[in-house]
Regions:
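Conserved, single-site charged/polar hotspot
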Residues: 1-472, 477-506, 510, 514-547
Length: 547
C-alpha cells in the first residue's frame, strides 16, 4: 500500500498545478471554412509551427514535428488521420486534439485576414450530426482569444484607449454571449459572434490593450452585461429592446436592459420624437463621436421598379424570420408597391416597424435587421435602419423614386466602434469613460465569484490588471462570514468583514501593484459563503466618475 503524501509534497504538487493552470477561463470557438460559408468540415489538413501532440480522446498518440502534416477525414463515424506518406496514424470515433506547447496549430488552406490561419491553444476535431462531417473547435484561454479578436473588430489606428474599451466589450461578449450557436462551442469566429482570426493577425497595440484590461469585465449589479457593439451608431445609440427580439420567445420589442439604453453623443442633441426631427438629424451632419466613419451619413436611391424588385426578391426569405405580417411564401407576388410607411421608431430614430403598402396588401415589417435586408440597394442591405425616406410619384400616383437618408452602420446598440475611436484619439478620453458612455450604470471589475465552505472547493484565483494599483473588494456577505484567507501577489493576508453590514467594500490598494495582480482566495472554513468582485478605482480607471 502506498504511503500517504506528506503535506510539503502536496503543497509542491499543488503549486506546480497552479503554475501551469490557465490564467483565464477556457472558451471554445467554432472555426468556419473560408468565407465562413460553413461550420461543417469534410476534410482538413493540420500542421504546427513547433512540435505538437495528438490526442485520441484523452489518450496521447505521440509527439510530432513541423514536418508532420496530418490529413483528417471522417468516414462511417470514424476519424481517419493520415500523414503525407499515406500512412494511417489513427482510426477512431473519439474527438481528436492537436496541442503545441511552444507553437501554433495551423489549418492548411484556411485564410483569415489574408494570411494563413494559425491558432493559440488547442485545435479539437469533434463529430457533428451530419454524416461524415465534423466541427473544428479552438479551445483557448479568454485572454489569448481576445488577441485574435480586438484588432479584427477595431482598427488599431483608433488608439489604445478605444482598443481597451473594445477589449472589455469583447471579453464580456465571449463570457456572456447572447446566443450559444452550437453545443460543441461557445462562439464562432465570424460576425455571427465576434470576428476572431487567430494568432497571425495579432497586433502589438491591440495586444497591449488586452493586457491592460486583463480580467476586467463590465458589470451591472452582480451580472456581466451583454456588451453589444457595432461599427457606427450615427450620433445616437439605441435601446436594446427596440432592436433585438427575445432569443427564446421571439417577442419584439424584447425586454429592456437598463445598461443598453438610447443615448445621444452630446446632451444638446434634440430628442428624435417626430418624423421631422428624425429627417433633420439624418439629413444633416452634426458634430458627433461618429463623424469620422464613412457611414456616419449615407444616401441610397431606387427607381420605383428597383424598390419593387428588391422587396419582391427578399420578402419571402425575410418572412421566415417571423417578423413580416402577413408572411409571404416563395413565388408569391406582393402587388405593386405604393408607399413605404414608417409606423414606429426607436429613440435614435431607428425604424422598428415599417409598412410596405401595395395595391392589394399592407405588410408590416418589424426589426431593424429584417428591414435592412428587405430594402436592399444594388444587392446590399441598408447600412442601418436609422433612415428616412423621400418618395416621389408620377401624375398617375405611381411610386417612381425613393431616396433614403441614413446614419450609422450596424444595429447601433451599445458601444459604437468609430465613436470609441474618436473619444479616445480626439477627445483623449480613457477607456472607462468610453465604456460608461455607451453602457449605463456599469462598474468595471473582475468576474463575480462565490466562495463557499463545500469540501470540494479550496481556492479561487483571479488575475487582473490595474494601471493605478487601486481596487476595492466588493462583498455580499449574506451569511455573515467573519473572514477569509487570501494570497495577494504572493503575500498571505486575512481579509476581515463587518458582519453587521451585508455589503462590504474593502480597499485592497495597499496590497496591489500597478499592472498585473493575482489574488488567490481561500474558501471559508466554517459553513457559509460569500460572493464578491474586485472593482477598479482611481483616476485612470474611473476618471473621477463616482456614479
Amino acid at each position: 500500500m502506498a504511503s500517504p503524501l506528506s503535506a510539503d509534497l502536496k503543497e509542491q504538487i499543488t503549486n506546480i498545478i497552479e503554475q501551469n493552470a490557465p490564467k483565464s477561463k477556457l472558451i471554445r470557438v467554432g472555426i468556419g471554412t473560408n468565407n465562413f460559408s460553413s461550420y461543417f468540415w469534410q476534410d482538413v489538413t493540420i500542421y504546427a509551427t513547433d512540435d505538437y501532440e495528438i490526442f485520441d480522446g484523452e489518450i496521447p498518440i505521440g509527439v510530432f514535428t513541423t514536418d508532420d502534416i496530418i490529413n483528417i477525414k471522417r468516414i462511417n463515424k470514424n476519424f481517419i488521420l493520415i500523414n503525407e506518406n499515406g500512412d494511417e496514424i489513427i482510426n477512431t470515433q473519439n474527438p481528436i486534439t492537436f496541442s503545441s506547447k511552444f507553437g501554433f496549430i495551423g489549418i492548411k488552406g484556411l485564410k483569415r485576414g489574408g494570411v494563413n490561419a494559425v491558432y493559440r491553444g488547442e485545435i479539437e476535431i469533434v463529430p457533428c450530426v451530419k454524416e461524415n462531417q465534423f466541427h473544428i473547435v479552438n479551445e483557448i484561454e479568454v485572454e489569448q482569444y481576445l488577441k485574435g479578436v480586438v484588432p479584427n473588430e477595431m482598427p488599431v489606428r483608433f488608439g489604445l484607449e478605444a482598443l481597451k474599451a473594445q477589449s472589455v466589450a469583447a471579453r464580456n461578449y465571449v463570457l456572456s454571449p447572447r446566443i450559444k450557436l452550437n453545443p460543441n462551442y461557445d462562439v464562432v469566429d465570424s460576425v455571427a459572434s465576434q470576428v476572431y482570426f487567430g494568432a497571425n493577425t495579432e497586433k502589438e497595440l491591440s495586444n497591449q490593450a488586452v493586457k491592460e484590461t486583463q480580467g476586467i469585465v463590465a458589470l451591472y449589479g452582480w451580472d456581466l452585461i451583454l456588451a453589444q457593439y457595432s461599427s457606427t451608431a450615427g450620433g445616437w445609440s439605441e435601446s436594446f429592446e427596440n432592436t433585438f427580439s427575445d432569443v427564446k420567445t421571439k417577442a419584439f420589442p424584447s425586454e429592456s436592459k437598463p445598461y443598453l439604453i438610447a443615448k445621444p453623443d452630446y446632451d444638446e442633441f434634440e430628442a428624435l420624437d417626430t418624423e421631422e426631427k428624425v429627417a433633420e438629424f439624418y439629413k444633416s451632419k452634426p458634430k458627433s463621436f461618429d463623424e469620422n466613419s464613412p457611414y456616419f451619413r449615407w444616401e441610397r436611391e431606387w427607381s420605383g421598379q428597383d424598390i419593387q424588385d428588391a422587396v419582391q426578391a427578399n420578402i419571402a426569405a425575410q418572412s421566415t424570420t417571423g417578423f413580416i405580417t402577413p408572411a409571404v411564401e416563395k413565388g408569391e407576388t406582393i402587388g405593386i408597391i405604393k408607399a413605404l410607411n414608417v409606423k414606429k421608431r426607436g429613440l435614435s430614430g431607428k425604424i422598428m416597424e415599417l409598412e410596405i403598402e401595395t395595391d392589394n396588401q399592407k405588410y408590416l415589417v418589424q426589426k431593424e435587421l429584417v428591414i435592412r435586408r428587405l430594402l436592399t440597394n444594388k444587392g446590399k442591405a441598408l447600412p442601418s435602419a436609422n433612415v428616412v425616406f423621400e418618395q416621389e410619384y408620377n401624375e398617375d400616383g405611381q411610386l417612381i423614386y425613393v431616396k433614403a437618408y441614413g446614419g450609422g452602420y450596424g444595429h447601433g446598440v451599445g458601444l459604437s466602434q468609430y465613436g470609441a475611436g474618436y473619444m479616445g484619439t480626439e477627445l483623449k478620453m480613457p477607456f472607462d469613460k468610453i465604456l460608461k458612455h455607451y453602457y449605463s450604470n456599469i462598474v468595471l471589475a473582475t468576474e463575480p465569484i462565490i466562495l463557499s465552505s463545500q469540501e470540494d472547493q479550496q481556492t479561487t484565483t483571479q488575475t487582473f490588471y490595474t494601471k493605478t494599483g487601486k481596487a476595492i473588494l466588493v462583498v455580499d456577505n449574506k451569511y455573515k462570514t467573519k473572514s477569509i484567507n487570501a494570497n495577494i501577489n504572493n503575500i498571505d493576508k486575512i481579509i476581515e468583514f463587518d458582519k453587521s453590514d451585508r455589503y462590504n467594500q474593502i480597499d485592497l490598494s495597499s496590497d496591489l501593484k500597478c499592472g498585473e495582480n493575482t489574488i488567490k482566495f481561500y474558501y471559508p472554513e466554517k459553513d457559509g459563503g460569500i460572493r464578491m468582485y474586485i472593482e477598479l478605482v482611481g483616476e485612470d480607471d474611473r476618471s473621477n466618475d463616482k456614479n
